[in-house]
């Protein structure tokens, strides 16, 4: 639940000054464009300055990361791997790669790669093929036979072309059985009531444990033919063993070049992958969060629960990174002042942490993305997620600098500011302070926002159910927004002027109320947690500040704009909403949470929605962005000893995914 997805892909990030460490190459930043997607390359500045052991560690961790790719596809939908492999076979074997039908087929395959399956990575809606079923059946007849068939042709066509079948990967609509109506592969043969009862029994049996495990995090819940409900655990020897064995192989190599502290962390992760015991996962997390000195770091595992409608099952992901020493200075200042921020938060004092422990924050350079972090990735991460670990041992927060930089370069000169920002003064602020405001918002969100506050006695942390992710992201965003406008940030040298905050306030309200709507199909509701969070904050503040015209909707030349008229009063509203959101989380107030989310975060004004889509389309700006990864190659001497690691930047999206399919695909087609 602690991952920040920025809105850079929409073009909100303005022209800004760039770090000298980031050198623009001659290659274009955008390497592919299709449908609502742009694919961007990212660079890895500073890699050449790492020690040989650090470079080698990154190589092994990157190999481990790529070995988990199939897991994410399978978690998203039971038939994803069979479908992907069938499409890849047709694509690679097709003699004629021309014509409208093939172009539509290629676009569909690119979308499947990007989303790790046949459902959109953000809206969760199933893709609609733009090629005909008749043409597709011809390709199946030509290129699919008994030897390479992954799925029966009729079932495949029904899945692809029947709009009602498996229509949504994640359905959180009010009043539906979110388990039955979601196509994700976390549950099979069970309904929502059965799932909730199964895990509630576990929670009740462990009610007095101050260090509870994350029940159900690393398993699929199924019902057998006799009606017995049980977990298929994701571990070596269990579900996904073929991929996990490869991951562990590379982790074992990584341990040989890691420093002693990190070696212990890696060995703990290996132990967990072998046992599947969530107590081992907690032990690994405690060791991982305590390692704040290692220059190279990584995430590898079943981490975030966004893809589960009940917020219990975790998707597999990996991020390999190293420290951006210069940029870390700002996060070190934040971490040093963490107790002050906690003590002065505008929330009930009972819900403040008396002692903030283990706050570790840094700015990182990503070296490899995988699983649920590839191709689309977060711009900030705060882990671990277990409340008791965060309270007793702290958390690690990171801002991913080279990713935000790549988004920035890809967005420059796209005309977004001129189209959607009404006032010249706001455009000027965005130009001068937009990048700094975005970076600091991410830092505050991850470093302090997620780690702030505490639960009331008796609250377990799972009471908010389907609304928990939205509320948690709103809580962290509000914390960041509130403190961005505090003179304390000027005092400690994080910002030169409050104009940095006002730039972010204008951006945030505009995006939450208006511009993010371009990502949603006309007539649909807002489903994704981060989008719901931003809409909730923007619309609540608009409504509560309406009497004093704090935020204003302006019509000019037939176009709608949203402007902030009073930044100080808006900050006060952020504080008031943060107080209520923290109360809801601390007390586990499900009904209040439901009312807040359903009242402000879900439904869209259809006229405004249509206008935003049309204006955004005229700019030819894809609302979503993702990445191609760099490649690493070991350089050895005549005796086979590693003497260096070579870094290259592939710039072909299709080639990278076909290469991954050939070299890093280990799971059966149906799991």
Could you say what each language-model-derived stretch is?
Residues 51, 259, 469-486:
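An active-site-proximal "capping" alpha-helix that borders the catalytic cofactor pocket
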Residues 15-17:
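C-terminal motif of bacterial Sec signal peptides marking the signal peptidase cleavage site
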Residues 453-474:
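Post-HEXXH active-site segment of zinc metalloproteases
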């Amino acid at each position: 639940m602690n991952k920040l997805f920025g809105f850079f892909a929409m073009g909100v990030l303005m022209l800004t000054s760039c770090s000298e460490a980031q050198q623009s190459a001659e290659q274009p930043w955008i390497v592919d464009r299709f449908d609502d997607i742009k694919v961007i390359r990212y660079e890895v500045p500073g890699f050449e300055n790492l020690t040989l052991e650090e470079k080698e560690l990154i190589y092994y961790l990157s190999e481990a990361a790529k070995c988990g790719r199939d897991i994410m596809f399978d978690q998203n939908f039971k038939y994803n791997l069979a479908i992907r492999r069938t499409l890849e076979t047709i694509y690679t074997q097709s003699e004629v790669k021309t014509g409208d039908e093939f172009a539509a087929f290629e676009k569909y395959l690119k979308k499947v790669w990007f989303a790790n399956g046949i459902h959109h990575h953000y809206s969760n809606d199933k893709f609609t093929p733009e090629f005909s079923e008749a043409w597709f059946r011809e390709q199946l007849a030509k290129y699919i036979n008994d030897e390479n068939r992954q799925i029966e042709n009729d079932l495949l066509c029904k899945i692809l072309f029947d709009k009602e079948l498996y229509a949504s990967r994640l359905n959180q609509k009010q009043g539906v059985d979110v388990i039955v109506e979601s196509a994700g592969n976390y549950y099979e043969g069970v309904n929502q009531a059965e799932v909730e009862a199964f895990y509630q029994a576990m929670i009740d049996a462990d009610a007095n444990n101050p260090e509870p495990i994350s029940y159900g995090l690393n398993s699929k819940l199924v019902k057998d033919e006799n009606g017995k409900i049980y977990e298929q655990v994701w571990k070596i020897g269990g579900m996904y063993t073929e991929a996990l064995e490869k991951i562990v192989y590379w982790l074992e190599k990584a341990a040989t070049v890691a420093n002693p502290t990190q070696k212990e962390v890696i060995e703990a992760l290996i132990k967990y992958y072998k046992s599947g015991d969530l107590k081992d996962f907690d032990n690994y997390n405690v060791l991982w969060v305590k390692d704040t000195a290692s220059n190279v770091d990584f995430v590898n595992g079943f981490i975030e629960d966004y893809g589960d409608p009940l917020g219990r099952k975790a998707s597999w992901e990996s991020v390999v990174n190293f420290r951006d020493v210069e940029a870390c200075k700002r996060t070190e200042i934040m971490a040093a002042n963490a107790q002050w921020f906690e003590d002065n938060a505008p929330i009930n004092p009972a819900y403040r942490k008396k002692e903030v422990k283990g706050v570790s924050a840094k700015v990182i350079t990503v070296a490899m993305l995988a699983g649920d972090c590839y191709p689309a990735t977060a711009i900030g991460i705060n882990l671990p997620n277990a409340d008791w670990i965060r309270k007793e041992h702290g958390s690690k927060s990171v801002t991913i600098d080279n990713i935000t930089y790549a988004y920035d370069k890809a967005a420059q000169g796209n005309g977004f500011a001129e189209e959607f920002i009404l006032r010249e003064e706001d455009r000027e602020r965005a130009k001068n302070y937009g990048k700094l405001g975005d970076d600091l918002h991410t830092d505050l969100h991850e470093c302090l926002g997620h780690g702030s506050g505490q639960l009331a006695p008796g609250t377990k942390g799972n009471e908010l159910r389907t609304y928990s992710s939205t509320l948690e992201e709103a809580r962290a965003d509000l914390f960041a927004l509130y403190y961005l406008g505090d003179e304390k940030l000027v005092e400690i040298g994080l910002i030169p002027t409050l104009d940095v905050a006002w730039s972010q306030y204008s951006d945030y309200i505009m995006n939450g109320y208006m511009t993010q709507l371009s990502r949603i199909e006309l007539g649909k509701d807002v489903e994704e947690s981060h989008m719901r969070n931003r809409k909730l904050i923007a619309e609540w503040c608009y409504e509560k500040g309406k009497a004093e015209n704090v935020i204003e909707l302006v019509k000019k030349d037939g176009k709608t704009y949203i402007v902030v008229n009073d930044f100080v009063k808006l900050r006060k509203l952020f504080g008031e909403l943060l107080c209520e959101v923290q109360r809801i989380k601390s007390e586990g107030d499900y009904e209040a949470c439901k009312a807040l989310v359903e009242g402000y975060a879900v439904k869209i004004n259809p006229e405004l929605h249509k206008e935003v889509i049309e204006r955004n389309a005229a700019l030819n700006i894809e609302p979503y962005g993702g990445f191609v990864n760099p490649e690493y190659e070991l350089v050895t001497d005549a005796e086979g000893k590693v003497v260096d690691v070579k870094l290259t930047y592939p710039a072909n999206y299709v080639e990278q995914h076909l290469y991954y399919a050939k070299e890093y695909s280990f799971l059966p087609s149906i799991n």
